Amino acid sequence: MNYNWDWGVFFRSTGVGSETYLDWYITGLGWTIAIAIMAWIIALTLGSILGVMRTVPNRIVSGIATCYVEIFRNVPLLVQLFIWYFLVPDLLPQGMQDWYKQDLNPTTSAFLSVVVCLGLFTTARVCEQVRTGIQALPRGQESAARAMGFKLPQIYWNVLLPQAYRIIIPPLTSEFLNVFKNTSVASLIGLMELLAQTKQTAEFSANLFEAFTLATLIYFTLNMSLMLLMRLVEKKVAVPGLISVGGK
């Protein structure tokens, strides 16, 4: 294919104010990172709680966590996003509806919807990783803690979870990378994250190949950097004698 690449397009004016196409990418990357970080905070927090719930010796508690996982893991992310953005606001009390629909600007409401949606969707996956990490520990860990007089919350907080987190760093890293990639669904509800800015650049500049090539390089560089960083963290906190789940 005889195609003349024009990489200088990113430094040209978009025709909207004084912005260049590169400015659009920077703005989109900022939204992508913000969505991913906020969603990951939700996922790691709730996923840890539900992961613990799935391993406690109480059928009701573990059953609640199991139901959550099965529901959120088996409904497509895009369907969940549309539910959170179009349906859930109409189910809120009138005061919250007015705040969400009238006081918030469309960008903020879209941001909140995608953060909650992606956070709760990823929670189900993190829950399973935490459960696997806890169950991978030697049974003697819990028995020894009980013999020392630890109560169940103390056993999880002081003994099981610190070790479980260390051995599930590889799969948690994969989930974190998935969060970054899944932020692209935000473009479907009007949030101008990286993918949306890429499509807008392609439409305005007519440089389709350059626009999506740059987006691909940004996603690849970001995810590879995170993966390499987490490999260093994994080596730093590795527990001698324990094998990482999904690792070597």
Over which residues does each language-model region extend?
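Transmembrane alpha-helices and adjacent helix-loop boundaries
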Residues: 1-248
